[in-house]
């Protein structure tokens, strides 16, 4: 695992297993981050296409069937699709990084699930290793964790995780960390967060 922040366990107990949390859409809730990304990305589109892109994203995030009839995994897929052929990959990456900077600065509104701090405390009391595993960069994640009052409640934070492709590496590392072959993954994206763990047994 790379790009990780780790807090050592100080109670001396043998961990009983690992509980892995995703970040966006799991402990950080709301459309603010993807709307921020869209605002920066769509600004690079011609005016007519920009209006259509904004309308399509609004429909998708509102749960309506889009006028294109497409199916996306999340709002980020919508933004990328609407920009295809008009905004190069480096332009989309810059838009994404700008949105994460706004998240880090507290300019994007997000919420956490009710009761999350207590839940993490309970997991720690049970001897679980609590991991935050995200494909997002640390910038934006770290600051949000702090604003949520979750500092010290994760034993390990791994950013730039490369899910789903690198799950095998992560599972092996978590098994070494906990000394157990028990892992629970909690996330909002089936392909990224759930299916690879089920497939690994």
Annotate each language-model stretch with its function:
Residues 32, 115, 136-137, 162, ...:
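Short beta->alpha linker loops
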Residues 131-184:
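Substrate-recognition "cap/lid" segment bordering the active-site pocket of phosphatases
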Residues 188-200:
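Acidic, divalent-metal-coordinating active-site segment for phosphoryl/phosphodiester hydrolysis
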Residues 55-105, 114-125:
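A metal-dependent, Asp-based hydrolase signature
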Residues 3-61:
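Active-site neighborhood of HAD-like aspartate-dependent phosphohydrolases
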Residues 115-122, 144, 173, 196:
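A short acidic, amphipathic alpha-helical/loop segment
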Residues 15, 20, 103-131, 168:
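Short, acidic loop-to-helix structural element flanking the phosphoryl-transfer center
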Residues 20-22, 133, 186-187:
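Generic enzyme active-site microenvironment
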């Amino acid at each position: 695992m790379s790009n990780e922040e780790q807090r050592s366990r100080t109670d001396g107990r043998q961990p009983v297993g690992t509980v892995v949390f995703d970040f966006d859409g799991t402990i950080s809730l709301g459309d603010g981050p993807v709307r921020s990304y869209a605002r920066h990305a769509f600004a690079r589109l011609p005016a007519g296409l920009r209006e259509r892109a904004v309308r399509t994203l609004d429909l998708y995030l509102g749960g309506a069937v889009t006028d294109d009839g497409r199916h996306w995994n999340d709002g980020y897929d919508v933004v990328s699709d609407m920009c295809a052929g008009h905004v190069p990959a480096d332009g989309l990456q810059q838009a994404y990084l700008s949105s994460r900077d706004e998240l880090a600065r507290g300019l994007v509104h997000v919420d956490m699930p009710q009761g999350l701090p207590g839940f993490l405390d309970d997991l720690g009391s049970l001897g679980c290793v609590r991991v935050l595993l995200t494909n997002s960069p640390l910038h934006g994640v770290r600051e949000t964790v702090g604003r949520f009052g979750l500092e010290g409640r994760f034993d390990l934070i791994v950013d730039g995780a490369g899910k789903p492709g690198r799950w095998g590496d992560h599972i092996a590392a978590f098994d070494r960390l906990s000394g157990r072959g028990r892992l629970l993954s909690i996330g909002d994206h089936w392909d990224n967060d759930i299916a690879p763990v089920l497939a690994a047994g």
